[in-house]
Amino acid sequence: MGTSNTVSRALRLIGESGLDDGGVEVLAERLGVGSRHLRRLFLRHLGATPIAVAQTRRLHFAKKLIDETTLPMNQIALASGFGCVRRFNAGISKVYHRTPTQIRRLARQTKLQPGNQYVFRLHFRPPYHGEGMLAFLAARATPGVEFVEEGCYRRTIFLNGRDGYFEISIDQESSALVARIEFGDPRSLFFIVERIRAMFDLNADWSAIVQSLRFDPALIDRVESDPGLRVPGCWNGFELATRAILGQQITVKGATALAGRLTASFGRPLSLSLGLPLAAAKGLTHLFPTPEVLADAKLVSIGLTGARAETIRALARAVADGKIQFEGVVDADAFQQQLCEIPGIGRWTAQYVAMRALGEPDAFPSSDLGLLRAMGLQNPRELEKRAEAWRPWRAYAAMYLWKIGSQAAGGGSKLASRIQKMGMEGTVPQQVPMSL
C-alpha cells in the first residue's frame, strides 16, 4: 500500500478518536507501521505530526464555535474535544494569542444561528466533483431518511440519544461544503462534522490519487474531463450494509424503494421535540432502523425474499452483539471476511461496504459487471490484474469506471438491458453492476 493511503487511514481513525487511547504509538501499531515512520509520513504529506493535525482540527473547530455561536466556553471546550476548560484556554491562547473571551468580543457575530442550529464551512482540496457526489447519493437516498434536491443533500441522524439532521451544499468558489446542522447536544458537533467530512471524502489527496490513474488509457480521458471524483462514504455503516443487501439483483431504483419501505415499517419517526418540523418539510421524516430492531423484524412483509430477510437479520444480530463493528477498523481484509461469514453476503458486498463504510481507498469489487463492461473484460481475474496499476486507489478507479459504464449503457444494447434487470448494489454468485 502507498504511503498516502496510510495517511488516509490514519486520518479516518483520528476522526474516530483514534488518538484518545494510547496516542501516536497505539495508532501506528493499529496501522501496522512504526510511530516514527507514521510521524514522517504525516510530515511529508501534511507538514505536521498526527498530534498536531488532530490538535489543529480541534482548535479550528473551537474557534468556529467561539465566533459564530453563543455557547458557553465550557460547552465549547467539551464540543471541540479538549476535555477540560484549562486545556482549551491554553490551546486557544497559544495559537491565537488571545483568550477565548477576547476572541468572542472581537467576533462580528452578525449571523448567529437559532439555538441548536449551526453552520460550518468544511474545506477541501480542489478539484472536487460535487455534481458526481450528489448524483451518486441522490440515486441511493432512502426516502424519509435522506433527500437530495437543487444541489443540496439532507439526512436525519441519531447520536447519543438525540435526533437531529443536517444538510450539505457545495460552494466550489471557496472550495468548501456548507454544512447546516441541527442537533441538541453541542458535545456531539465535532463528531458530526468529522463524519460529514468522511462521508463526502473531503480529506482525499487528489494529487496523489491521480498519479495512479492518469496514465491508464482506459481512465485518462475521464480523469482529465471529470477531475476530483470522490468515493461517497456514509453516515452509518450498518445502514449502508443493509442498503447493499436490499439491492442484491435489483435496480438501484428498486432498492431505494425497498429501503423506503423498510424505514417506514421499522424506522422510528424523527422527533419533533427540538423544533424539527422544518426537517419534515424538507423530506426528512424517519430515522433508519437500528440493528436491534431489524434483528427480529418480519422483513418479508415489505416484499423481501426469505433468504434476503434472513441475511439482513443475521447482519443486524452480529452488529447488535458487537461481533461486527464499522468504526475503528484497520484490517479491511479481516473485516470483509467477517461480513462474508454471514450467509447471503459475498465478496462484492464486502468490497462495496469496505469502500464506502470504511473509506477503504483500495477496495475494489472486481466481479462487478459495470466495471467489467467499462474495461471490455469478461473475467474478474483479468480486471484484478489490470487494476494492480491503480493501487492503492482502486476505489477511485471504480468510481470512474462506473461513470464510464453507465454512459455506455445508454445505447439500448442487450448488455444494457441485462444491466437494467440485474441488481446494482448487492452480491450474489453473478456479477452485479452499479452505476452513477
Segment roles from a protein language model:
Residues 1-436:
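HhH-family (HhH-GPD) DNA N-glycosylase catalytic core used in base-excision repair
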